[in-house]
UniProtKB/Swiss-Prot annotation:
GO terms for biological process: regulation of transcription by RNA polymerase II; tRNA wobble uridine modification. The keyword Cytoplasm applies. It comes from Bos taurus. Pathway: tRNA modification; 5-methoxycarbonylmethyl-2-thiouridine-tRNA biosynthesis. It is found in: Cytoplasm; Nucleus. Component of the elongator complex which consists of ELP1, ELP2, ELP3, ELP4, ELP5 and ELP6. Component of the elongator complex which is required for multiple tRNA modifications, including mcm5U (5-methoxycarbonylmethyl uridine), mcm5s2U (5-methoxycarbonylmethyl-2-thiouridine), and ncm5U (5-carbamoylmethyl uridine). The elongator complex catalyzes the formation of carboxymethyluridine in the wobble base at position 34 in tRNAs. GO terms for molecular function: phosphorylase kinase regulator activity. This is Elongator complex protein 4. CDD domains: Elp4. InterPro entries: Elongator_complex_protein_4 (IPR008728), P-loop_NTPase (IPR027417). Transmembrane segments: none annotated. One of its GO terms (cellular component) is cytoplasm.
Length: 423
């Protein structure tokens, strides 16, 4: 009886537990650690900041470079806390566009900017940023540039039909609240966006003084001043990741123009064995340390083609996380080469960061070319256009027939001498 009573009690208790579980929708699955529910919960691992997204490869927080095609090549975007080095083209025509795209993306996304230059006033640089294109305006503004170059789906290629299956580097635009935007380089960014944005300017001629002594730290005065300026902005404005602020988090976009040029007081572009060759590498080393512990991303343009010592270029590459080189066709033999008639230069992905990985995939970053259209700067996969003419084949047959007449009947011909050479 006792046993029966116990079983009955157990049955009733089990039934009541099941009923309670069904009433409260309780499952057997339990999350590890504290729950992320509730308005006051701060346990979310991923930081939610406007204009950013986590990488699908390594979970790193990414920002857009302002050029969606370049974001795709870099694995989704530029990782926060890293340095993007742009090797300037020979005449410095196309590299400033990537620099301006990066800054314009920061203004549209609501990020803070830090613009440093020894050549041009940062305020003037911001005035020359391209205007953003949002959804509907993209169709109106880019019909002439993009739609005219698209292949009709009903027209099939006669030669090299496999090109139809290649992925396209450019995609449609997105709304202002999403990741990455398109820009019209023929128009300037609205003045209202510049006035509402938060930016800091570093113009070297205004910051440097002749009495500044940096012999103890072995850095040029320009580099030392810039490092101090960046450090102050990171710590005072709350971009320090190791000491997070309670206010709303934001991203600091740092843009440094023409680093390593003589305008910065560096002579690595003048002589091969200069006394300050270590100054640039030490600057990059300290800069990376500041970026690693902060919510910031940096883009640097550098005239590497002017650096005399190739060993310095290798060190600069190793001290950068991502390296992209631009090779312009202006002034070279490729400018008149019919194979490159549809492009203005080549783009080389020298290095991709290994973030939370041992290796990185470089299979999709080869054979790339860029084209500057009327309103867009596009990156495309380099390919040769199909040759649909038969002029070459006909002329070669005529030349071959004439050569067989000169060779005579003893060189691979029959007695009649009417057949071509038999290989």
């Amino acid at each position: 009886m006792a046993a029966a009573g116990t079983c009955g009690t157990g049955t009733r208790s089990t039934g009541s537990m099941v009923a309670a579980a069904s009433t409260n929708n309780v499952t057997s699955f339990q999350r590890r650690g504290p729950r992320a529910s509730g308005a006051d919960s701060g346990c979310s691992r991923l930081v939610s900041i406007a204009g950013t997204r986590p990488s699908v490869r390594n979970g790193q927080l990414l920002v857009s470079t302002g050029l969606p095609a370049l974001d795709q090549l870099l694995g989704g975007g530029l990782a926060v806390g890293t340095v993007l080095l742009i090797e300037e083209d020979k005449y410095n025509i196309y590299s400033p566009l990537l620099f301006k795209y990066f800054l314009a993306e920061g203004i549209v996304s609501g990020h803070a900017l830090l613009v440093a230059s020894a050549k041009e006033d940062p305020a003037d640089i911001l005035q020359k940023l391209p205007a953003p294109l949002i959804d509907d305006s993209y169709k109106k503004e880019c019909d002439e540039d993009v739609c005219s170059h698209k292949m009709e789906p009903d027209i099939k290629m006669k030669i090299a039909w496999r090109y139809q299956l290649l992925p396209k580097m450019e995609a449609g635009p997105v709304s202002s609240s999403r990741f990455g935007h398109y820009y019209d380089i023929s128009k300037r960014i609205p003045q209202e966006l510049i006035e509402t944005s938060k930016w800091h300017g570093f113009f070297l001629p205004e910051k440097i003084s002749s009495a500044f002594n940096v012999e103890s730290c072995s850095l040029t005065p320009g580099y030392m001043k810039l490092l101090q300026f960046i450090q102050n902005i990171i710590y005072k404005e709350g971009f320090d990741g190791s000491n997070p602020q309670k206010k709303q988090k934001n991203i600091l976009r740092i843009g440094i123009q023409n680093l390593g040029s003589p305008l910065w007081g560096d002579d690595i572009c003048c002589t091969e064995n200069c006394d300050t060759s270590h100054s640039l590498t030490k600057f990059l080393y300290i800069l990376r340390g500041l970026l690693r512990t902060s919510l910031s991303a940096c883009i640097i343009t550098m005239p590497t083609h002017l650096i005399q010592n190739k060993a310095v270029i290798a060190r600069v590459t190793n001290l950068s996380d991502t390296v992209v080189g631009l090779e312009s066709f202006i002034g070279s033999e490729k400018e008149t080469n019919p194979l490159y008639k549809d492009y203005h230069g080549l783009i080389h992905i020298r290095q991709i960061p290994r973030l939370n990985n041992l290796i990185y995939d470089i299979s999709d970053v080869k054979d790339l070319a860029f084209k500057l259209k009327k309103k867009l700067f596009t990156i495309e996969r380099l390919h040769l256009p199909p040759d649909l003419s038969d002029t070459v084949s006909r002329s070669s047959k005529q030349d071959l027939a004439e050569s067989t007449k000169l060779l005579g009947p003893g060189c691979g011909m029959t007695a009649g001498g009417k057949k071509h050479l038999d290989f």
